[in-house]
A protein has these predicted regions:
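Conserved non-catalytic scaffold segment of RNase H-like nuclease domains
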Residues: 1-64, 79, 84-101
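Short secondary-structure transition/capping segments
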Residues: 26-28, 108-112
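Hydrophobic side chains within alpha-helical segments
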Residues: 52, 72, 108-109
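Conserved beta-strand -> loop -> alpha-helix junction used to position metal-binding or nucleic-acid-contacting
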Residues: 62-74
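Generic alpha-helical structural context detector
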Residues: 72-75, 86-89, 112-115
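Catalytic phosphate/metal-binding cores of nucleic-acid and nucleotide-processing enzymes, i.e., regions
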Residues: 75, 80-82, 144-146
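Acidic donor-binding loop at a coil-to-helix junction in glycosyltransferase catalytic cores
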Residues: 104-105
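Acidic two-metal-ion nuclease catalytic site recognized across multiple nuclease folds
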Residues: 111-172
Length: 172
């Protein structure tokens, strides 16, 4: 593993050898869970994760996948920066979750962030299959079939309901 990944996650080559799962086995197990679809995949910066998932599941049979990108939601809720670590702080979750870049910690952190977002405003469903992207840089990677991509600039804080990305899309 590259040193930056070891530094970020604490996962070493030795640990991968003793505790890791072979990619083909992981792909088969994940595909089995998703075969009947639809499956809602949730990620912070889902476009990034979707590229990895697409590669992992290449050749596997899966049902429809819907996407909820918490980064798109968060950009309508808070000012820059927009990392998951920033959302953990913004929603006062630092004593409850960790941002360790380890799968289980990140899943638990994202779950708590989404609960806080839903408590703040019950509109998460309107963000399903809607990804905002920075108009300065465009969409990174291949676009996901079924996802609508819209330019989304930075906000200065909690956006009024009528100014959120989903509300602007509906008005068009």
């Amino acid at each position: 593993l590259p040193e930056n990944i070891v530094s970020l996650t604490g996962i070493t080559d030795e640990r991968l050898q003793t505790e890791g799962v072979q990619p083909a086995k992981a792909a088969s197990q994940i595909a089995k869970l998703m075969q009947n679809g639809p499956t809602l995949m949730i990620a912070h910066n889902a476009q990034f994760d979707a590229c990895f998932l697409r590669g992992l599941l290449r050749g596997q049979k899966v049902g429809r996948i819907d996407w909820l990108d918490s980064l798109t939601v968060y950009k309508d809720r808070r000012a820059y920066p927009h990392k998951l670590a920033n959302a953990i702080i913004a929603y006062d979750l630092t004593g409850k979750v960790q941002n360790s870049h380890r799968a289980i910690d990140d899943v638990l952190a994202l779950f708590e962030v989404l609960k806080a977002m839903d408590d703040e405003r019950e509109d998460l469903g309107s963000y399903v299959n809607l990804f905002g992207y920075n108009p300065k840089y465009g969409v990174g990677g291949r676009r996901i079939v079924g996802v609508r991509y819209e330019p989304q600039s930075f906000s200065k804080g909690l956006t009024r309901p009528e100014q959120t990305l989903p509300a602007r899309v509906v008005r068009r």
